[in-house]
Amino acid sequence: MLFRSEEVGFVPKPLVDTTQRHMKAELLGHTYNAPFGFAPMGGTSIASYQGDLVLARAAANANIPMMMSGASLMRMEDVRAASKTAMFQAYLPGDEDRISETFERCAKAGFETIAVTVDVQVAANRENNVRAGYNNPLRPTPQLAWDCMLR
């Protein structure tokens, strides 16, 4: 058994000074105002104009963590410029040259933290996206407008 409830408990401390309480948390050498932030979400620009820039600016203003998705529709350089503590989540292709290019571009953009995502062993077959007319970056098409109206 991985978790035994009898080994975990809360210890109340009712007689302590609470005038200086805060939610600050340190993560990877940076102190943030909260122990939570924006997770990597590919395609936020579909939901909001320049969605990743909006999130990066909000994270910078609130001093909370923000990780840019490798599936973002925004340029990493622009997102990093909007938030000096933004991190980058990379889906690495199986090609060493492209991996090196990704890391070099992240370094040039100023990213200090890169999270490497390793949830699949083989790159996805995107034939269904091609047949459906999906392209990245997303471009307005009559079919896209029709799909949006239907949903």
Model feature map: region roles:
Residues 40-46:
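Glycine-rich phosphate/pyrophosphate-binding beta-alpha loops
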Residues 47-52, 68-88, 92-101, 105, ...:
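Active-site-adjacent beta->alpha loops and helix N-cap segments on the catalytic face
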Residues 112-151:
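Phosphate/diphosphate-binding glycine-rich loops and adjacent basic-rich segments that engage nucleotide
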